Each structure stands twice: as C-alpha cells, then as structure tokens.
C-alpha cells in the first residue's frame, strides 16, 4: 500500500509540475506584447494606405486594390502596389532563410532592424513614395515572419491580419453564452483575442487621427 501511495503522489506531483510549466508565460507571449503588436499592425497599414494608397502588411488587400482600381489613371499607384507585394515576399523569404540558419537566440531582434531603420529615416528624406514603399514592405515581410506563430499567453494570433483573431474572439464569446465546457478558458480566449482586436483597431484609429493633423503640416514644411 505504501508503494502504491508513493506512486500516486509522484504522479500527482508530475502533473502539478507540468501544469505550472504550462502557466509560465514567456515575455513575448504576454498580453502587453500582444497589444503592442496589434497596435503596430493596425497603424502601419492605415498609414501606408492613407499616405501611399498602398498596403504593406495585408498583401491580399493589395491584390484586391489592384483588381478594383485596374482603371486607375495614376500608374504610380499600380507600381507601388506591385512593388509592395514583391518586396514583402522578398523580405519574408530572406527572414525565413535567416531563421533557418540562425546562430543566436536574439535573431528576432535582428530581423526587426530593417523596419526600425526605415521608419526612422522616412521622415528625414524627401517624399518619394515609389522608393519608400518597397523598403517598408521588405521590413514588414521580415517582421511578419519573425512573429509567425505568436502567442498571447497560450493562444495563437496574427499581428497584421486581424480577421482570424476577430473570428476566434466571437467563437469564444459564443461558447461563453452557451454556458458549456471550460468557461474559464473561453473567457480567457475572449479576453486575449479581444485585446489583440481592440489594439489593432486602436492603432488604426490613432494613426488616422494623427495623419489628419500632421500630414498637411508635414507637407507645408517640405
């Protein structure tokens, strides 16, 4: 009996240790990080659409714009959308190569440098949209690969295209209203995906408001 009891105790302790390990949230998987990445994702595409009439993160959106505006007399818009798709793809593939041959644990930080440098330099140079868009798209492609498979706590999400996050939030809310299953887990899912979706929308609105006031002023000083 003593041996049997010890075995049961060991099994319980092992399960408890595994549960504790599962509850450990890495720094990149916190709600704060999810909110920041969602904010950046929403703000980046709104800025590029308002400033360049092109998207850099939602490339399916660029394809739709190309088809919908095929009669657009401004060839510059078409060129920027094509270049955005091309350089986003190149940036994503370059980042994929770097990830496969990484030799340091800080590879994610290095792959954020291109987008960081571009966003610092753009306000300092003259307005040349056909040149600026490819660089932003390249850095965004690298960032997309860097955060592929991102988690907010234990739930996977996408930092740029938030339709999937919104769908998961609605699914969790529906299950909560049904009152069946693990309600605590569903509430946590709804909260986490709600944070990502809310921060994405907040980033988009914030940039749109800033562009309304800053954009005309910036042009008067060029």
Regions found by a protein language model. Give the residues of each.
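Conserved small/polar residues in nucleotide/adenosyl-binding loops
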Residues: 1-7, 220-221
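Short, positively charged and aromatic/hydrophobic N-terminal segments
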Residues: 8-13
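Alpha-helical transmembrane segments of multi-pass membrane proteins
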Residues: 16-17, 21-222
